[in-house]
């Protein structure tokens, strides 16, 4: 299987690109095992310096596959992409007291391989699938009529209120009313205190003094 994949593949490489391999691998991991069309879209929308380098390299690999090997561009997949360390350029930055700090300018080597992978058609995928038995339809259950429940008797916790019947007022006879009116002034006269006559006492005192 591996030999078949490599026999229908094309490669492209570029060396000594002025970029750190650690930063370039971040973009390379995005397109690994992706189709060629998906990889192109990812690289065009990724805002990284390495995306421009890898995009040119991928277009070169696709052109090699279609022109040199006669492969179908729609079936190409990025089966391998490598980013290796290139030669490091050493520079120095001068500092005070005669000191010099080193500067390492790293470079990277890129390698990419695209292979033609024949994806199984829809008919092959359906033929391999086992035919599932049709699911049994559940038998319709006969629903029993719902029995009417007897209403619950509510037990009231309130105590029964005793109603006192008001007795009807007895109307007095007109004769009794007149007798009551006559009796009232007589009773009022008896209640009034009788004033003693002071004239008699004064006259007796005067007679005694004489």
Curated annotation (Swiss-Prot):
One of its GO terms (biological process) is translation. Transmembrane segments: none annotated. InterPro entries: Ribosomal_uL22, Ribosomal_uL22_bac/chlpt-type, Ribosomal_uL22_bac/org-type, Ribosomal_uL22_sf. Residues 123-210 are annotated as: Disordered. Residues 158-185 have a biased composition (Low complexity). GO terms for cellular component: cytosolic large ribosomal subunit. Keywords: Ribonucleoprotein, Ribosomal protein, RNA-binding, rRNA-binding. Residues 126-157 have a biased composition (Basic and acidic residues). It comes from the Bacteria. GO terms for molecular function: rRNA binding; structural constituent of ribosome. This protein binds specifically to 23S rRNA; its binding is stimulated by other ribosomal proteins, e.g. L4, L17, and L20. It is important during the early stages of 50S assembly. It makes multiple contacts with different domains of the 23S rRNA in the assembled 50S subunit and ribosome. The globular domain of the protein is located near the polypeptide exit tunnel on the outside of the subunit, while an extended beta-hairpin is found that lines the wall of the exit tunnel in the center of the 70S ribosome. Part of the 50S ribosomal subunit. HAMAP family: Ribosomal_uL22_B (MF_01331_B). Belongs to the universal ribosomal protein uL22 family. This is Large ribosomal subunit protein uL22. It comes from Metamycoplasma arthritidis (strain 158L3-1) (Mycoplasma arthritidis). The gene is rplV.
């Amino acid at each position: 299987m591996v030999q078949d994949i490599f026999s229908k593949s094309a490669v492209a490489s570029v060396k000594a690109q002025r970029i750190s391999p650690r930063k370039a691998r971040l973009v390379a991991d995005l397109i690994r095992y992706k189709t060629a069309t998906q990889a192109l879209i990812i690289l065009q929308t990724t805002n990284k310096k390495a995306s421009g380098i890898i995009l040119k390299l991928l277009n070169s690999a696709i052109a090699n596959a279609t022109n040199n090997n006669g492969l179908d561009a729609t079936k190409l997949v990025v089966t391998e992409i490598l980013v290796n360390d290139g030669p490091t350029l050493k520079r120095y930055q001068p500092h005070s007291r005669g000191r010099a700090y080193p500067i390492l300018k790293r470079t990277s080597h890129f390698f990419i391989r695209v292979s033609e992978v024949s994806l199984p058609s829809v008919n092959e995928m359906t033929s391999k699938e086992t035919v599932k038995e049709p699911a049994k339809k559940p038998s319709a259950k006969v629903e029993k009529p719902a029995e009417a429940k007897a209403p619950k008797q509510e037990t009231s916790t309130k105590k029964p209120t005793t109603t006192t019947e008001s007795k009807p007022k007895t109307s007095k006879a007109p004769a009794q009313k007149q007798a009551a009116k006559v009796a009232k002034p007589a009773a009022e006269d008896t209640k009034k205190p009788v004033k003693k006559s002071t004239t008699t006492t004064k006259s007796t005192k005067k007679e005694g003094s004489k």
